[in-house]
Structure formats: C-alpha cells, structure tokens
Regions:
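Intrinsically disordered, compositionally biased charged tails
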Residues: 1-3, 223-280
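Ribosome large-subunit tunnel/peptidyl-transferase-proximal elements
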Residues: 2-233
C-alpha cells in the first residue's frame, strides 16, 4: 500500500509546477500536461517516487545513521524544522554553511566553540569577565547557533540528505555529490531531477505540498527508528537468554560432576571390609 495517494497530493497542490518558460527539459517524464501556461505534474508518478524515497530513508534510519534535512526557503523552513525535530534528525533551515559537508572538520570546530562557550556559562568563567566581553561572547554564540542549527548534534557526516528545492540548495547538492552522499529531494519542474539520487516530482513552493511530502518521509524514518529499537531489544533478550542457558548448563554440568564424585566415594567405601580387631 502506498504511503500517500493521488487525491491527497492533488488537494495539497503538489501537481502545480512552474511556468512553461521556466521548465527544465529533464522533468519532461514527470509532466502530465500544461494548463494556462503552467506545467502540471503527473501525481501518479509522484506517488511512486515518494514510496521509493520513503522506503530507502527508512532503511537508512533503521541502520542507525543520520539523515540531514535541508530547507532554507521561507515557506519550508518552519514546516521542516517542526517535523524533523520530532524524530531527532539534524536539519539546516537557515543559511547553508559553505563547506558544511566538504569542510566538515572546520564545522566541527565551530560546534566545539559553542560547547566551550556553554561550559564558560556554567563553570563560573562568566563571573570573572566584564559585561562587554560577556555580551560579545553571547552574541557570538547566538550567531553560531543560528548558522549551525541542529547540526551541533552531528558528530560525523550524514548518511543522506533530504532537500526541499534543489535549485535553491544547489550548494548542498553539489557538496553531497562530491562526497558520494545519497540525495533525496522534492523537485519542481524548473529543476533537474538527475542532480539527485531520489527525485520526488512535486510542487516545492506550496507549504501544503511540502508539509504532506515531508510528513510522509519523516513518518517512514520514524518507523525505521522504531524497528531498530525493537531489533536491539530482541538481540539483548536473545543474548541474555543465551547467557542464562549457558550458566544453567554449567551449573548442571558441575552438579553432575559432584554427584558422580560422591557416588564413586560411596561405592569405594562400601567395597571395603571392616578391619578385624586383634586381642592382645
């Protein structure tokens, strides 16, 4: 059963593309028709592509790896932040930090700087500096948080990127491609679907379309995380069961050895004749 359907996508306005004069010819396979100078996306193909992307991302989440969401356009940032925050995945909804992926070591230094400032505020260091210095450090920390967002929790490169509007986020797409990081994206009629690994043909401007598709994707990831948790619990139970069985077997074996030893002593004692008393 599909994770979404034609009617839901239609109601969300996912079928509306861009003006014909702004189209990217590579999107031709996903265009159903043209109406009033606007390309109409074939939602039957969108349903298929949503399922493909959702299933792949579910498996990535199940493996325990991180998926980075990128959506800095006004109508997408709040929607994506809310939905992605709920599943504990990192996201960038402000400006994309250049070199975020290709120069990840430098980004990590900025993250460590944030951590250092946080430590200063709790270990009493702030009490020994002037108000001016304190204000400067606080502003620096706020700027870092705005630029880095939730990626402060990202200790290593993400296993995949999910992007809203690859034309706007072309730098993120290019960095991911350079590092062979799989890319998933909502791709409108003005963009090249071949620029990403999993393209979902749909309106990437309407908030309703973005919310619907992002919601389906985050739900699939949530399923993957839940299955991972169940698998880990099952493995722990099996491991504990194996240990218990081994301990019981060792106890039985030890008990059998003791019994065998006692039986041997008893038999040896029974075979001896009592010593004859000699009268002097």
């Amino acid at each position: 059963m599909s994770r979404t359907n034609f009617n839901d996508l239609l109601e969300a306005g996912s079928h509306f593309g861009h003006l014909k004069r702004k189209w990217n010819p590579a999107m031709a396979p996903y265009i159903f028709t043209e109406k009033n100078g606007i390309h109409i996306i074939d939602l039957n193909k969108t349903v298929v592509k949503v399922d493909e992307a959702a299933d792949a991302l579910k498996q990535i989440a199940k493996s325990g790896k991180k998926i980075l969401f990128v959506a800095t356009k006004k109508q997408a940032k709040d929607i994506v932040a809310d939905k992605v925050k709920a599943i504990g995945m990192p996201y960038v909804t402000e400006r994309w930090p250049g070199g975020m992926l290709t120069n990840f070591a430098t980004i990590r230094k900025a993250v460590k700087k944030m951590a250092t400032i946080d430590k200063m505020s709790t270990d009493g260091t702030f009490d020994n500096i002037s108000k001016k210095e304190k204000l400067q450090i606080s502003r620096e920390r706020a700027k870092l948080e705005t630029n880095l967002g939730s990626i402060v929790e990202l200790s290593r490169l993400p296993a995949a990127l999910f992007i809203v509007d690859i034309s706007k986020e072309h730098i993120a797409v290019a960095e991911a491609k350079r590092l062979n990081i799989p890319t998933f994206a909502i791709v409108d009629t003005n963009s090249d679907p071949n620029a990403v690994d999993f393209a979902i043909p749909a309106n990437d401007d309407a908030s309703t379309s973005i919310a619907l598709i992002t919601g389906v994707i985050t739900k699939a990831i949530e399923e993957g995380l839940a299955e991972r948790k169940v698998d880990k619990e099952t493995q722990a139970e099996e491991k504990e069961g194996t240990k218990t069985s081994r301990d019981e077997a060792e106890q039985l074996s030890a008990g059998a050895k003791v019994k065998s030893s006692n039986d041997g002593e008893a038999k040896g004692g029974a075979g001896k004749k009592p010593r004859r008393k000699i009268n002097s």
